[in-house]
Structure formats: structure tokens, C-alpha cells
Curated annotation (Swiss-Prot):
Cellular-component GO terms for this entry: chromosome; cytoplasm; DNA topoisomerase type II (double strand cut, ATP-hydrolyzing) complex
Subcellular location: Cytoplasm
Keywords: ATP-binding, Cytoplasm, DNA-binding, Isomerase, Nucleotide-binding, Topoisomerase
Organism the protein comes from: Thermus thermophilus (strain ATCC 27634 / DSM 579 / HB8)
Family: Belongs to the type II topoisomerase GyrA/ParC subunit family.
Enzyme nomenclature, EC number: 5.6.2.2
Oligomeric and partner information: Heterotetramer, composed of two GyrA and two GyrB chains. The two subunits form an intertwined dimer where the GyrB ATPase transducer helix of 1 subunit connects to the Toprim domain of the other GyrB subunit through a 10 residue linker. In the heterotetramer, GyrA contains the active site tyrosine that forms a transient covalent intermediate with the DNA, while GyrB binds cofactors and catalyzes ATP hydrolysis.
Gene giving rise to this polypeptide: gyrA
Further comment found in the protein's record: For the electron microscopy studies a GyrB-GyrA fusion protein was made with a Gly-Asp-Leu linker between the 2 subunits. It forms the expected dimer.
Protein name: DNA gyrase subunit A
The organism's taxonomic lineage, starting at the top: Bacteria, Thermotogati, Deinococcota, Deinococci, Thermales
Length: 805
């Protein structure tokens, strides 16, 4: 009679949940450390083996295998069994598939497989290796779910499946994620451990440097050793991409993608980024994969930088992913996080036990056969007497007893004599039996040595591993390399030339140099920026996007921005106010700009002020330039910076004034001082209202011209050799013939002849013209028209655009 026991619901929930959790952990989601299989996978392989669906035989319907497994060993849904079977057949999921599938088993695009009634399957050769010697009492069996049959607790696993195919699974409160590896490398590492049980992780990694994913790709070295040592970690995996040319356009060709990435989803992800204009240089995207292999073609704009686009794709798409490592497996019925060395030792212990039990089984069989052969040989030695004894017996049992009593035979030996065919009585057959017996005795001796000697046992394990490597070993697919796992902004932004403009009211912007097309000398120019009527452009120059932009203020402070941090806008846009980018005081404004590639280089900064002062300070003094800025120069009341340039100790400086005067002197006359200093006199003015407009730094004897640009848009080139070297502090010589027609000097620039000149007016017009079109004149001349300006406009700034190399 049934008995009802009252139980606290909290206690029942607690106990039931623990039972459920342990069932999921041990019997469903986590692999056994010995064969690397979950129960459903083990049952599928064993069910296929029992059905005789072996390599070399014909495929059978997947539904037949699923039904066999479900009915005999795994009383759960057929969908779960079929899903597990399909995954073991997918070469993009398993490094070494255990099932050989025929038909539609899905795709790397995430397409579902055909129904089980349409597909066919059989064990793959490697799958069969998992069951090798299972008929030799190598593993323990247990009753199936209803006690009607026996199923293996673990497979013999001649293949180190957990290491080569990895595993993934989510249990209750824990999850496992083991990466796949290359079989040849795993075997080499296991052999090294057999030869040196005290082997270190570093020594193992000489043979097994890292995971080897079925889809190939690139794997970062960073994190591999830590994951192997602790059992936990994260590895960065990238697609393999090469650059091809199609016409004049670069094409990124993806040939391998990261493990467990859905190709169709990846392509959709890239397309979405292009549509959202997060990546702007992609003009075409095609999936060109076929039976020859995976191929995704990403066509770029003409002139685009493939590496920058690739870095953007790595950052924003699954072309770069993280593989989480959690080496969790079932050990003696309990889940444990293991190191790589632990995994290897557990597998070797399992194989030692399998080989020991196999040897014991084979020894027993060999001894039984040798025992029978001994009886047969005795019978052949007394064949006439044996025949007479058998003929004289009433029946077989009495004949067996008579043989046992007469020759001291066992029942098995006597029965074997009775079962012997007459043809074995010939002399040749006796020789064959003797040969077989001698062979058996050698085999028995070998098997006993294996069982008695640990070294011989390990040698047998090693031989099995080397056989597997010889038969199934292949080349590594995943390239282990070093790459930056995270991206700096520079990695995602093309290092292209940018035009930087700053207005009198402090509006700053950048736009690509290619926006300014070259025009002939004397043109009207293009609108470069919309300014308010009272606003004027004061600075324009060209710098690369990755350069450091140093901004010097009227208070003598310096700030730093990356050029790419400036807002990129169209030619007619005003820009963003500099105070939204820098922590400037209320009455502080930018007075001079300079671009450098890093502040840790040798050299000096040369400063020139409007009142003719000049100062020299080592560039390294500004290395600690942070968000808050630094003091760059101490300015006198009413004075302001007009120019800053990089220099070497042996260089010379030229200061040019708006009234057309210029002085050239060696910079060694300007003693290098600290940041918070004022400087010394560089030039004296003929007219009190004159002021310095340009600072030029040249090398001694440099074969260059000095290009003068006036406020009314006139210009000329004059050889540097026409400017005598003087001592600093003088009035210099005439460099430009100023007049009402041509205006005053706006800028003096160093040119070689192959560059372009970029001129910006106060009303926002800009012109870019080849320097070679501007003729050479002597110092005391005005030159030719460079830019045709309206009466109410004048040149604000000019800059030389270096020739492309």
C-alpha cells in the first residue's frame, strides 16, 4: 500500500533542483574527460557501431540510427539526437568529424539540415577509432535506461577526442568551452608527456602551440598560455584576409572566418555597417564561396586604404571574435576545471587502462588458444592411439572422457581433438599448428611484459598514438601569430593629408586635402568655408590625420589634439569652436598651430612673436603635454605668437615682416631655454607699426626658394641664396616690394618647386595651385597674381602642400 509522507516544499524544491542540476551536468551537458563525449554523442556512436554502420559500408538513413539510439539507449526526443548527430558530421564545427554524413547536413551559413528521413550517415574512420577494441573488455558497461541492454560508460577513444575536437555545453550554473586542436600536435605533446612525465607547460607548448580551429583563421598568441595553465581564458580569433586588385580598386578577400561564426550573418553585418555609413569605403560585397572553399569579396573605393577598412571590419564585425576557454569536464563523476596538462594526463591514464585491459583480454584469449593447441599437438603425436580410442568409444562424451583420462587433457582440449577435421592429420598441418603455437607463446610473453612493466605499457600507448597520427594527422589550419587585439583610433582612421583651418573667432575644422583640386595660377578659388561677415580665416595648413596638432594660445600655453579628433566637415561648413575641444580661458584664443608626429623625438621648437622675439626650446620638454595644456612661452603684454616650427641645432631661421623685410640668422645664436621663458630679439623693425608675419626654418646651404604671398594675392619665388646670413637682432634685407596694388606681405614659405601652394582668404575662398607655375623673381619685386580676390577680401594664410611620393 502506498504511503504518503508530508515534506516541506522548500526542502523538496532544494533536493529536486540539486538532482536535476546534477543530471544535467553529468548526464547531458558536459563531456567526460576520458573520451570527450557527452552521453548522447557516445550513444550515437555506439548505436551506429552496433548497427554495423561502419566506414567502408554503405550509408544508412539517419532516421534509422536515431531510432536505434532512442529506442535502446537515449529515451529522449529524436530532434535532440538528430541535432547531435548532425553536429558530429559538420566539418566546420568539428575539427575531425566523427560521423560521415551524406546529403544536406546544413551549412556554415546557418542553413538547417534536411530532415533525418532524407539524410544518410555512417561512422567516419575517426569515429570508428573511438570504438576500437570496445569488444575486448576495455571499458565498463552499465545497464541501459530499462535494464534490457548494456551500454558503455566511456569509449576506448584511440583518438584524444576532447583535445582534438573540443567541446561546448551549458549546464546548470556552469558551462564548458574547450577549443579544438591539431591531431598531429596533440599526439606529439602526449608522446612528449609519456617520455617525460614531469614535463612543463612551456615544453608541451613547443609541440602544441595553441588551438587549431576547423575554419582556420588567425589566432593571437596572447592569452593561450594563461588559458592552458588555469583552464580559463579568452582568445582572439581573426579571419584570414588578403588584398587583391580589381581594375584600380582594392578588394578585401576573406578566405577563412573565425570558428563558430555564421557566414551569412557576417555578410549581413558588414552590409548593415555600410548602409549606416559607419564604414564608408566599401562599394561592393559579394559571397563568392563555392565547392573550392569560402570566399567573401569586399570591394573598396578607388584609393581607399585596405588596412584601415580591414581594421574597421575587425573592430565592428565578427571578422574578429573572442573564443572563451573554460576547460571543464567530468572527472570521476564530478565537474572539474582542468589545465591542459591535467587534460593530457587524464587521457593518458584512460588509455593506459584501456591498453591494460585489452592486453589482459588478448592474453586470456592467447592462453586459451595455446592451451587448445597443446592438446592438438599431443593428439597429433599419438594420432593412431587417439583414433583407436575414439573409434572404441560408444559416444562423444565417453570419447572425451577417455581422451582426458589417457592423455591428461582438459575438457576444452579433448573437445578440440574431437572437433578436429581429418585433413589436419597431415604432416603439413602439424607444422602449421606448431608455428601458430610458437607465435602464440611469443605473443603471450609480449602481453605479460606489457602487464608487468609500466614502461612497456606506456610504449604500447605511445605506439597507438603514433599509429593514429600516421593515419589521420594533417597540417595545421589556424595560423598562430601576434596581432593587436584592440584598436587605437589610428588603426581605424586613414592617415591621409587633411587641410586644417582656423578662423579669427576660433572655429576649427578639417577636411581631406583632395577636396581642394588644383587650379591654374590666378584663379578665383573655391569656397573653403562659410564665415560670418565679421569672422575671417586666420590659419590654414596641411597635416596628416595621425599627426599631433599643437595649438599655441595668446597666453603662451600649448594644447594637443590628434588631427583626426578635429571635426571633419565640408568646404562650406564653419567648423566647431575650439573651446568645445580645449579647456581655454574666457579671453584665451589660438594664436599658432603646428603638427608633429610624436613629442618624444629629438629637436627643438622655435617660436617667433609678432614683435620680433624668437625662442628655442627642446621638443622633449613638452612630452607630458596633457588635457590641461602646458606653458609654452612667456609673452610680453600686447605681443602674440605668429609662428612655431621644428628645428635641429644647426638650422637657420628666417623672420619675415608685413612691410617686406626678412632676416636670416643661425639658430645657434638663440640659446635653448625652458618652456616658461620669453626669448630674445630676432629682428628689429624699420617702421614702428611693422610686425613679423612668418617664421621659416632652413638647413644651411639648402637649395630651396622662398615663396612670398601678398595680402592681395600676388606671389613670387626667390632663391634662398639671395638672402645673406646675418646675426640675429638686425633689420635684415628687403624680401618683397609692398605697395597699394599688391598689398603687404602675408606669408613667406619654403618651397622646392614640386609642391602645391594652398592659399586661403579671409572670406573663406581657397585656391590650390602648383608652385612651379609661380615664377622666380629677385627679392625687391612683387611677382605675379596667384589668386584673384575681390576688393573686400585679402589673403589670410598660405601653406605648402608637399608633393606626393
Amino acid at each position: 500500500m502506498a504511503q504518503v509522507l508530508p515534506v516541506e516544499i522548500t526542502e523538496e524544491l532544494k533536493q529536486s533542483f540539486i538532482n536535476y542540476a546534477m543530471s544535467v551536468i553529468v548526464d547531458r551537458a558536459l563531456p567526460d574527460v576520458r573520451d570527450g563525449l557527452k552521453p548522447v554523442q557516445r550513444r550515437i556512436l555506439f548505436g551506429a557501431y552496433q548497427e554495423g554502420v561502419l566506414p567502408g559500408r554503405k550509408h544508412v538513413k539517419s532516421a534509422k540510427i536515431v531510432g536505434e539510439v532512442m529506442g535502446k539507449y537515449h529515451p529522449h526526443g529524436d530532434a535532440a539526437i538528430y541535432d547531435a548527430l548532425v553536429r558530429m558530421a559538420q566539418p566546420w564545427n568539428l575539427r575531425y568529424p566523427l560521423i560521415d554524413g551524406q546529403g544536406n547536413f546544413g551549412s556554415i551559413d546557418g542553413d538547417p539540415p534536411a530532415a533525418q528521413r532524407y539524410t544518410e550517415a555512417r561512422l567516419s574512420p575517426i569515429g570508428a577509432e573511438m570504438l576500437l577494441d570496445i569488444d575486448k573488455d576495455t571499458v565498463d558497461f552499465r545497464p541501459n535506461y530499462d535494464g534490457s541492454l548494456k551500454e558503455p560508460e566511456v569509449l576506448p577513444a584511440a583518438i584524444p577526442n576532447l583535445l582534438v575536437n573540443g567541446a561546448s555545453g551549458i549546464a546548470v550554473g556552469m558551462a564548458t568551452s574547450l577549443p579544438p586542436h591539431n591531431l598531429s600536435e596533440v599526439v606529439d605533446a602526449l608522446v612528449a608527456m609519456i617520455e617525460n612525465p614531469a614535463i612543463t607547460l612551456e615544453e608541451v607548448m613547443r609541440h602544441l602551440p595553441g588551438p587549431d580551429f576547423p575554419t582556420g583563421g588567425k589566432l593571437s598568441k596572447k592569452g593561450i598560455k594563461e588559458a592552458y595553465a588555469t583552464g580559463r581564458g579568452s582568445l582572439k580569433v581573426r579571419a584570414k584576409v588578403r588584398v587583391e586588385e580589381k581594375g584600380q580598386r582594392p578588394v578585401l578577400v576573406v578566405t577563412e572566418i573565425p570558428y563558430q561564426v555564421n557566414k551569412a550573418s557576417l555578410i549581413a553585418q558588414i552590409a548593415a555597417l555600410v548602409k549606416a555609413k559607419k564604414i564608408e569605403d566599401i562599394v561592393g560585397l559579394r559571397d563568392e564561396s563555392d565547392r573550392q572553399g569560402l570566399r567573401i569579396a569586399i570591394e573598396l573605393k578607388r584609393g581607399a586604404n585596405p588596412q584601415v577598412v580591414l581594421n574597421q571590419l575587425y573592430k565592428h564585425t565578427a571578422l574578429q571574435t573572442s573564443f572563451t576557454v573554460n576547460l571543464l569536464a567530468i572527472v570521476d563523476g564530478e565537474p572539474k576545471v582542468l589545465s591542459l596538462l591535467d587534460l593530457m594526463r587524464h587521457y593518458l591514464d584512460h588509455r593506459k587502462e584501456v591498453v591494460r585491459r585489452r592486453s589482459l583480454f588478448e592474453l586470456r584469449k592467447a592462453e586459451e588458444r595455446a592451451h587448445v593447441l597443446e592438446g592438438l599437438l599431443i593428439a597429433l603425436d599419438h594420432i593412431d592411439e587417439v583414433i583407436a580410442l575414439i573409434r572404441g568409444s560408444e559416444d562423444a562424451p565417453k570419447a572425451r572422457i577417455a581422451l582426458m583420462e589417457r592423455f591428461g587433457l582438459s575438457e576444452a582440449q579433448a573437445q578440440a581433438i574431437l572437433d578436429m577435421r581429418l585433413q589436419r592429420l597431415v604432416a603439413l598441418e602439424r607444422e602449421k599448428l606448431l608455428e601458430e603455437y610458437r607465435g602464440l607463446m611469443e605473443e603471450i610473453a609480449r602481453l605479460k611484459a606489457i602487464l608487468e612493466d609500466e614502461a612497456r605499457l606506456l610504449a604500447e600507448v605511445k605506439a597507438d598514438l603514433l599509429r593514429v597520427k600516421e593515419k589521420y594527422g594533417d597540417a595545421r589550419r589556424t595560423l598562430i601569430t601576434e596581432f593587436e587585439e584592440t584598436f587605437n583610433p589610428e588603426d581605424l582612421i586613414e592617415d591621409e593629408p587633411m587641410v586644417i583651418t582656423l578662423t579669427a573667432q576660433g572655429f576649427l575644422k578639417r577636411l581631406p586635402l583632395e577636396s581642394y583640386r588644383a587650379q591654374g595660377r590666378g584663379g578665383k578659388g573655391l569656397l573653403a568655408g562659410r564665415t560670418k561677415e565679421e569672422d575671417e580665416a586666420t590659419h590654414v595648413f596641411v597635416a596628416d590625420a595621425h599627426d599631433d596638432l599643437l595649438l599655441f594660445t595668446n597666453r603662451g600655453r600649448v594644447y594637443r589634439l590628434k588631427v583626426y579628433e578635429l571635426p571633419e566637415m565640408g568646404r562650406q561648413a564653419r567648423g566647431v569652436h575650439v573651446k568645445s575641444l580645449l579647456p581655454l580661458a574666457e579671453d584665451e584664443e589660438v594664436a599658432a598651430l603646428l603638427s608633429v608626429r610624436g613629442l618624444d623625438q629629438e629637436g627643438y621648437l622655435v617660436f617667433a612673436t609678432e614683435r620680433g622675439l624668437v625662442k628655442r626650446t627642446a621638443l622633449k620638454e613638452y612630452q607630458n603635454l596633457g588635457q590641461a595644456g602646458l606653458i609654452a612661452i612667456r609673452l610680453q603684454e600686447g605681443d602674440r605668437l605668429v609662428g612655431v616650427a621644428l628645428s635641429d641645432p644647426e638650422d637657420e631661421a628666417i623672420l619675415a615682416t608685413q612691410e617686406g623685410q626678412a632676416i636670416r640668422f643661425p639658430l645657434e645664436e638663440v640659446r635653448a631655454t625652458g618652456r616658461d621663458t620669453q626669448g630674445v630679439i630676432g629682428v628689429r623693425f624699420k617702421k614702428p607699426e611693422d610686425r613679423v608675419v612668418s617664421l621659416v626654418v632652413v638647413k644651411p646651404g639648402e637649395m630651396v626658394d622662398l615663396l612670398s604671398v601678398s595680402t592681395r594675392g600676388y606671389g613670387k619665388r626667390t632663391p634662398l641664396s639671395e638672402y645673406p646670413l646675418q646675426g640675429r637682432g638686425g633689420m635684415g634685407v628687403i624680401t618683397y616690394a609692398v605697395s597699394t596694388k599688391v598689398g603687404r606681405l602675408a606669408a613667406l614659405l619654403k618651397v622646392r618647386g614640386g609642391e602645391d601652394l594652398l592659399v586661403l582668404s579671409r572670406r573663406g575662398l581657397a585656391i590650390r595651385t602648383p608652385v612651379a607655375e609661380i615664377r622666380q623673381y629677385s627679392r625687391a619685386t612683387a611677382g605675379v597674381r596667384v589668386m584673384n580676390l575681390p576688393e573686400d577680401d585679402e589673403v589670410a594664410s598660405a601653406f605648402v602642400v608637399e608633393e606626393e611620393k
